[in-house]
């Protein structure tokens, strides 16, 4: 199943409506296609968004306005929300999550040779943010994962008082 950009944007707007009336502090973990577009859209709605990645070169490129992939209008949107100081980029998930109320996990889950999902990137992100989550934080998993993964995340993060929401992305890039 693929979701077009309009549906992705509407999905982000719906999340934004949940946050409407607030100036939420949001951490987006993962600066790939899903993470960067999610972060830029949420920042355009007025939220304070920090996008984190463990690739220091990617973070440095984003800080100077270099977008690592093509998506119509994204470069301009990122520039606008960075200039308005609503979007910033950091190295390391914990650095983004320290002050955040909402944490969007947008990490790759590539397929293993046997067809199962490699959850190592997701697990690494969860481990990084677990020590800095504020009580009652909302963790939104946008990574595409097998059934039962949300429960595992809740078991890992629930001891911190975090609540887990599953909102996976199925999309087609750059058309």
What is each model feature region?
Residues 23-66:
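NAD(P)+-binding Rossmann beta1-loop-alpha1 motif at the extreme N-terminus of oxidoreductases
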Residues 48, 54-102, 108-116:
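Conserved N-terminal Rossmann-fold NAD(P) cofactor-binding segment
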Residues 19, 174-175:
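Short, intrinsically disordered, charge-balanced linker/junction segments flanking boundaries
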Residues 46, 84-86, 136, 161:
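A generic structural signal for alpha->beta connector loops
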Residues 1-22:
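Short, Lys/Arg-enriched N-terminal segments with co-localized hydrophobic residues
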Residues 110-173:
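Rossmann-like NAD(P)(H) cofactor-binding subdomain of soluble oxidoreductases
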């Amino acid at each position: 199943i693929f979701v077009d950009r309009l549906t992705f944007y509407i999905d982000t707007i719906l999340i934004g409506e949940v946050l409407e009336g607030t100036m939420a502090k949001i951490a987006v973990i993962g600066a790939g296609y899903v993470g960067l577009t999610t972060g830029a859209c949420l920042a355009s709605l007025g939220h304070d968004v920090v996008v984190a990645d463990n690739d220091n070169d990617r973070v440095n490129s984003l800080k100077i306005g270099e977008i690592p992939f093509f998506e119509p209008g994204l470069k301009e949107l990122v520039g606008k929300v960075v200039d308005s100081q609503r979007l910033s980029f950091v190295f390391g998930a914990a650095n983004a999550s320290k002050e955040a109320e909402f944490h969007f996990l947008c990490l790759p889950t590539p397929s293993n040779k046997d067809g199962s999902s490699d959850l190592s990137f997701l697990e690494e992100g969860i481990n990084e943010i677990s020590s800095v989550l504020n009580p009652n934080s909302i963790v939104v998993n946008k990574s595409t994962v097998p059934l039962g993964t949300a429960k595992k995340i809740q078991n890992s993060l629930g001891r911190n008082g975090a609540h887990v929401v599953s909102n996976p992305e199925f999309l087609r890039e750059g058309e």
